[in-house]
Every structure is written in C-alpha cells, then in structure tokens.
Curated annotation (Swiss-Prot):
The keyword Amino-acid biosynthesis does not apply. One of its GO terms (biological process) is cell surface receptor signaling pathway. Residues 263-273, 336-365, 439-449 are extracellular. This is G-protein coupled receptor Mth2. It is found in: Cell membrane. Disulfide bonds join 17-71, 73-78, 82-177, 83-96, 138-197.
Amino acid sequence: MAERDHYHTIDDPNVPCNFYDTVNLTGHRLFPNGSYDYYGTIVPAELVGTYDYIHSSLTERIEVREHVRGCVCKFKSCLNICCPWRQVFNSEVDGCIIDHTDNRTWPDPPMLNITFRNESTILVNMFTQFAIQSFRPCPKMFSLQPETSSWDDYLLFENGSMLRVDDKLLIRKNEFCMVPTYVNESDMFYTIHPANCDMQDDHSTVKIINSYAMMFSIPFMMLTIAVYLLIPELRNQHGKSLVCYLIGLTVGYSSLCYVQLYQVDATGVTCKVFGYTAYFFFMGAYMWLSVISFDLWHNFRGTRGINRFQEKKRFLFYSLYSWGIALVFLAFTYCAQQLSNLPDNLKPGIGDGVYCWLDMSNWAAMIYFYGPILAIVVANTIMFIMTAIKIHGVQREMARIIASENSTKNLRTEKDKFGLFLRLFLIMGITWLTELISYFVGSDKGWSKLFYISDLANAMQGFLIFMLFVMKKKVKHLITNRCSSVRDGSNQRQSQYSTKTTSSSVANLSLHEKPSVEKPLVISSSVDPQKTTIFR
C-alpha cells in the first residue's frame, strides 16, 4: 500500500539517526564538548551516537563492536564511495583492498560535475562539496561509463542523489556509490563514475514495479466508485461508506505512484504535498473501514440508539469521524516532522529531503502508520467476530420461534451485507498483513518471495473489490436497469419532441388557412389518389 522499500534494514531506536546518514568517527578528533572533527566538518555532540552494527549492504546488517558514528549527512550533503579512497573492490576476497600492482593514477582532487537546484552545472571538488561515506549498496554492481555509451549518461545533484538519464530514474544516495573506472586497459588515469546495483538487486526498479502494481488497482476502484454513485439503489449507508473508503485508497495510491514514477524532487514542496496527501487519504480509508465494521455490528445490536438520526445525519457523523481523525493524524505527523528537538529516528520522514513517504528504515513508520492501522484492524476484527456471534444467535432464535417473512428477509439482507464486507475486510487484511511483515523482515532475503505476494496483493485488490461489489448478479441487474431507463428516457424525450413538432406544424397550418364551413379541408393521400383524409 505504501511506497515500501523492499530491501531495507531497520535501525535501533536508541541511535540518533539512520545508519545511512552516518560516518565512522573512530580515530577522528574529539572535542571537550562531545563534538567531532570529520575532515574539517564539525559534527555536534547531539548528532553523535554509539552503534554496535553496520549495514554491509542495503539488505544485510552485521553486528560489530561498539563504535562512534556521527550524523554528518543531516547538515551536509553526503556522497557515497564504494570503497575507501585509493582502494578497489576485489571479488576474490569480497572486499576492498589497496592494489599495489595497479599503476593507474587517481584523480587528485577528484572533480565532479554537479547539477544544482537552479539547474546550473558546476565542476566541484568531491571532497569539499560532500561529506564522503564509504558503503557498497549491493553485492553485484556495474559502473556507468558515459564515454562509451549514451545509455550510461547521468546527472549528480547537490544532495548526493543521481538521475539515470536513459530511464529517468532518480536514485537515492544510499542506492549507488562512486567508483574509479577506466575504459581501456592502456588508460593510465582513473575516472570517477557512479556504480549501480545489478538489475536483480536494483531496489529503485523494484519500487517502480510496485508502483505499476498499484496503478493496476486504480481503474477498478474508480469504476466501482462510478457504479455506486450512478445507481440510486446502491447509494445507501453501506454504499456511500464503500465509496469514501475507495476514494481514500484511490487518491493515496495515485499520490504515491506520481511521486515514484515522475521522480519528484525529495527536497521540494511537491514532494511534501503528495506525501502528506497520500498519508491523509490512506488513514481516512482505514477509518472508513472501521465505520463499515461498526455499522454492520450496530445493525445487529439489540438496541438502535443511533437510529434516531436520519441516514443523512448518520453519514455526516461518520464523515466527520473518519476524515476528522485522519486530519488529526495528519496534523500530529506534520508537527512531529517539524520538531527540531525530536530525534530523527522518531520523525516520520515525509518530505525530509530523502523520502516523500514515510521513512521505512527506522521505527517511525510503526508509530505513524502501521501502529494506528494495527489498532484499527484489531478493533475491526473484534467487531466482525461480535457481529458473527450475533448473527448466529439471531438465527437460532428465529429457528426456535415462528418468524415472520419480513424478519427472515431482513436477516437475510443483513447477512448478505455482512458476508460481503467480511470478504472486503479479508482482502484488505491480507494486503495489510503482507505489508506489515515486509516492513519487519525487509532485510531478510529469505522472505523475499513475500514481497512479490505483497505486490500481487496491491495489484489485485482493486480488481477483487470490483468483482466483489460490481460483478454481483444483483448489481449487474441494477446496472442493466439503469442503462435501460436512461435509454428509454432518451427515446421518450425524442418521441415527445417529435409529437410536439407535429402538433406545432398542424397548428401553424390551421392558422394560415381560412376555415370554410361549406367546403372542408381535403388532403389527398400520397399512397392512393382515390383515398382522401378530411379534417374538419
């Protein structure tokens, strides 16, 4: 449902920031106030923490001896190099080494063309423009070499991200690294270029696929919304609640797809607008799911306290509840992101310059998204169970006594509604469950097949909802009747127009002719000249 990072490792809650925003401060100068000097950049004490692990790649977290790291990327743009400077990756040892047999010259200083926000491109010193990190995102990587192929053209931005020009894919700083390259064996100088993950490990590509999976659901949701708005018989309490629920999902999915597919700048206002829009409508959708659960449960209660309200007033109450609570969550999330004294691992991460959606690499997503949804799903489950128990009790009671035909019909109708929305709840429950599990085990390759199940659930849920709520025999019958009534109404209007035109012609004819008492008006028939029609 969300812009998930299938291949992420979650940081500990007690560290000051995401591992990918840190550098190792071991051996660097420590000041009495707790700050560190990292190659001329002062890292303040509040952005220094102790880590007992490292991320050896985007998918692996390794426990190591405690060491000090600083969140230098929080106040200076970082750029990632695959190996420490003047070292190269050796596949035999699966690590970085100093190759003493290599006589090529390293650039000193390394100069890079950087594109800035004003779209100007400037040649800058890599070491002065960026804080340098050393991290290899994936086991298998390939370097871009624009000297040999225009397909490898790229743009480096001032925030450390990169745009692959060929497929317009914006890649975050922790998903690629800079590497020394050469074109020919005879070349005596290294050139610094980015290296991408191999296609099977290309996390940005995986997220693009997930976006298309979500897009597959959107048309079916829109069709379902249209049917329930156009058919008067479906515009009851449950139908309107379903429409609001689907509107929330549709807008949420559309916002995330736009951000992902159009490579929205993570530092711009557009990123924040779409990120918070998606958050608000997703939360609103789940609140409407709880409304549906409550309304079903309420209809089977012995008392009917809320039934004193008319249906319009009840729908207004439900609307204020669902969208109002979603608005409260939105305000809470936005304020948390703006608090300067709140640790970064507790901030939602929406529009923070890296993400347009929630930061899935720490526990913030649990606080602002998965936690509230978990509470809603648990409450819905309880209400569905209570409703099922009540239905069973009513059935037994009606079997014991002689029930009227109306009572039996009403019970059957409510049971049908319950069964229908129970299936909806199961569809959403499975989707939500796979999302939650993928969040917790995102760095474990053994669970990688679950991600495909989650993508499939995202792709299929709109289609399943359409089949469940539109392709029912009763709804198809209503659609047929609606189309027939529209067609009949059009024919009737055409007939009325023709009749009115004929009457008008006859009236005009009567006005222009002088009536004669002795001599009636005779119109000869065009079919048979012997026959005549007389109008008096």
